[in-house]
């Protein structure tokens, strides 16, 4: 049986949205056990008597909050739901760690408690984002686990993302591109020029450089980038999308009757667009390169994204993603 | 544990972690200058030291540890 360790206290809607999502996904994942870490009384109250099978609660007394400094928090708040869950995974009792809490602290739990896979230089954070071309979206790695990157790291991240795209997203021979400031081979600073050369020498389906405006077009299934650029890029995409949607809604609803009628007529088209850019069904961002999948979903998430993230984690466990990485990186050392 | 035993354990740990020759590890070896250790390497090392020696190294103390010799001295003086 697979086991997922869940920090039930992370995020704005904890623990209710988390427990509700677990109860919703449980009948679908019959070979999976869910261990919830957090305030025992609060969690218990949310679980009906007849739905307690394959559910365990482990009581913890502290919570890591967003304002906590990540490394200090995981070293000091030893009885926090996140740290106790991470140690549970480290001990081998669960195969994956899931949280909606402080991203930095979760990354620190992954890197320092669960630990790096031997041969992996640096773990990296990878979400799946929507694209215009494909309903499957694309992966971008690293979006901020590393402030400083080396060319060799980018190659390992591409390899890990490649396994993920093949095994979890079912993409055959995924295309891999390097995010750069131009499409030509010699573009970029020394880090990106060297990364380009190294990526070209791999057996990955590397299609070269792409620029920022190519990302959402879906020019590649996997975009590799240094953590600094990746983080800035992700925030720019999220921020731009949010502003456009807000302005669109505002201009349709606050400009008299005609735009309102227009919006009503355009509703099926707008709904289809919304569905296409529905990020919830892609699940959470995964920290790849540590000894168990560590997965983060947005702190504001309601049941739906949490539900899909649990399905995504279950698939990673079924495909033994970490086992594949261990085999691969022990050979390449 | 004697100073020599502590040194040997730490040297083994560093040799494995940073893939460098065990013979090249001396007490003067500086984590940042000689190993090119960044903050992730350093925190990993400190947590590894805590696990290996069953010691708790507070952040303020950890920040002061710059060489292998200083780490050996710290572990020796904080043994249970």
Swiss-Prot record, chain B:
Phylogenetic classification of the source organism: Bacteria, Bacillati, Bacillota, Bacilli, Lactobacillales
This protein's name: Acyl carrier protein
Compartmental location: Cytoplasm
Gene source species: Lactobacillus johnsonii (strain CNCM I-12250 / La1 / NCC 533)
Keyword terms, alphabetized: Cytoplasm, Fatty acid biosynthesis, Fatty acid metabolism, Lipid biosynthesis, Lipid metabolism, Phosphopantetheine, Phosphoprotein
Similarity comment: Belongs to the acyl carrier protein (ACP) family.
PTM entry text: 4'-phosphopantetheine is transferred from CoA to a specific serine of apo-ACP by AcpS. This modification is essential for activity because fatty acids are bound in thioester linkage to the sulfhydryl of the prosthetic group.
PROSITE patterns: CARRIER (PS50075)
HAMAP family: Acyl_carrier (MF_01217)
């Amino acid at each position: 049986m697979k086991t997922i360790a869940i920090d039930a206290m992370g995020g704005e809607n904890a623990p209710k949205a988390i427990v509700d999502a677990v109860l919703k996904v449980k009948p679908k994942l019959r070979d999976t056990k869910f261990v919830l870490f957090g305030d025992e009384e609060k969690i218990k109250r949310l679980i009906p008597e007849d739905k307690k099978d394959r559910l365990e609660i482990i009581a913890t007394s502290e919570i890591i909050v967003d304002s906590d400094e990540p490394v200090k928090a995981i070293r000091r708040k030893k009885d926090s739901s996140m740290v106790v869950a991470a140690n549970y995974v480290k001990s081998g009792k669960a195969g994956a760690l899931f949280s909606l809490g402080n991203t930095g602290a979760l990354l620190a739990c992954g890197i320092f408690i669960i630990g790096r896979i031997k041969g992996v230089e640096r773990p990296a954070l990878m979400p799946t984002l929507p694209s215009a071309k494909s309903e499957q979206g694309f992966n971008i790695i690293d979006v901020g686990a590393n402030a400083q990157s080396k060319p060799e790291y980018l190659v390992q991240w591409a390899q890990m993302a490649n396994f993920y795209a093949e095994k979890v997203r079912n993409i055959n021979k995924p295309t891999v591109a390097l995010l750069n400031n131009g499409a030509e081979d010699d573009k970029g600073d020394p880090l990106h020029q060297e990364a380009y050369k190294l990526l070209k020498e791999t057996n990955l389906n590397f299609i070269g450089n792409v620029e920022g405006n190519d990302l959402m077009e879906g020019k590649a299934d996997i975009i590799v980038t240094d953590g600094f650029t990746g983080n800035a890029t992700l925030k720019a995409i999220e921020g731009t999308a949010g502003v456009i949607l807000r302005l669109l809604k505002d201009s349709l609803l606050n400009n008299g009757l005609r735009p309102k009628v227009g919006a009503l007529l355009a509703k099926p088209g707008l709904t289809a667009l919304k569905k296409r850019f529905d990020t919830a069904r892609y699940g959470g961002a995964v920290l790849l390169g540590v000894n168990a999948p560590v997965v983060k979903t947005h702190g504001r998430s309601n049941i739906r994204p949490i539900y899909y993230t649990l399905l995504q984690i279950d698939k990673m466990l079924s495909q033994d993603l970490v086992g594949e990485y261990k085999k691969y990186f022990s050979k390449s050392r | 544990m004697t100073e020599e035993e502590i040194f040997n354990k730490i040297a083994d740990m560093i040799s494995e972690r940073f893939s460098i020759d065990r013979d090249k590890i001396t007490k003067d070896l500086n984590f940042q200058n000689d190993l090119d250790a960044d903050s992730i390497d350093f925190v990993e090392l400190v947590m590894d030291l805590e696990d290996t020696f069953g010691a708790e190294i507070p952040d303020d103390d950890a920040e002061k540890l710059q060489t292998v010799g200083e780490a050996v001295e710290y572990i020796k003086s904080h043994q249970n």
